[in-house]
């Protein structure tokens, strides 16, 4: 059966286009077009979608710093739909969230796994949310290295040090003990929205716009 739209047959490859919607705003000065993410940034909304990489982390950090410079008193809203990614990239975002003056409210849409879950719980206390059917997954950091035995030992020590630090931070934000975090992240641990609230990863499940953005 021939697909309704064949990119190759029609001579159009849309893979790299992104298909990002544009928003047209009209004012006394005329019309202005924004991509949807730039328009939402004006409302102090940032998206972390997909893997946490150095590139995506730098984009989030830049937006956090920009919004702080625009207004250091108003909350920032970070929407997360991520399977996780680089620990160091995630820690860079985490440190920025803690560093800037505005509260950062986090919201899981879809999934927040691994480093995505870590950043979800890093939001301001009382302002961390999940949507009803979102999923959260926590586990210990993953790593692999090839080389001489002495180099492997060095990298193994680094992974263990990162694991210890991540557990301490998770314990701080969830209210769990470090031992509980170590136990519960030993293997992939999936939680629904309500279970994430009970564990302390988030503060509430949002079913409608009951929480008004400032």
Curated annotation (Swiss-Prot):
Catalytic residues of the enzyme: 114, 139
Chief location category: cytoplasm
GO BP term, example: protein quality control for misfolded or incompletely synthesized proteins
Alphabetical list of Pfam families matching this protein: CLP_protease
InterPro entries recorded: ClpP (IPR001907), ClpP/crotonase-like_dom_sf (IPR029045), ClpP/TepA (IPR023562), ClpP_His_AS (IPR033135), ClpP_Ser_AS (IPR018215)
Purpose: Cleaves peptides in various proteins in a process that requires ATP hydrolysis. Has a chymotrypsin-like activity. Plays a major role in the degradation of misfolded proteins.
HAMAP family in alphabetical order: ClpP
Quaternary assembly: Fourteen ClpP subunits assemble into 2 heptameric rings which stack back to back to give a disk-like structure with a central cavity, resembling the structure of eukaryotic proteasomes.
Protein name: ATP-dependent Clp protease proteolytic subunit
Taxonomic placement: Bacteria, Pseudomonadati, Pseudomonadota, Betaproteobacteria, Nitrosomonadales
């Amino acid at each position: 059966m021939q697909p309704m739209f064949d990119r190759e047959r029609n001579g159009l490859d849309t893979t790299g286009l992104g298909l990002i919607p544009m928003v047209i705003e009209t004012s006394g000065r005329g019309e202005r077009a924004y991509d949807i993410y730039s328009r939402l940034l004006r409302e102090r909304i940032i998206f972390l979608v997909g893997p946490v990489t150095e590139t995506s982390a730098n984009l989030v950090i830049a937006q956090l710093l920009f919004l702080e410079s625009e207004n250091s008193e108003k909350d920032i809203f970070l929407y997360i739909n991520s399977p996780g990614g680089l620990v160091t990239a995630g820690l860079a975002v985490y440190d920025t969230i803690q560093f800037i003056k505005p509260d950062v409210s986090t919201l899981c849409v879809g999934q927040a796994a691994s480093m995505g879950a870590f950043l979800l719980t890093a939001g301001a206390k009382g302002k961390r949310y999940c949507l009803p059917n979102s999923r959260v997954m926590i586990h210990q950091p993953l790593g692999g290295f090839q080389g001489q035995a002495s180099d492997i030992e060095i990298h193994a020590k680094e992974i263990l040090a990162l694991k210890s630090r991540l557990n301490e931070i998770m314990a701080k934000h969830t209210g769990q003990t470090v031992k509980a975090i170590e136990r519960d992240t030993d293997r992939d641990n999936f939680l629904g929205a309500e279970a994430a609230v009970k564990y302390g990863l988030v503060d509430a499940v949002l079913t409608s716009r009951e929480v008004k953005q400032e």
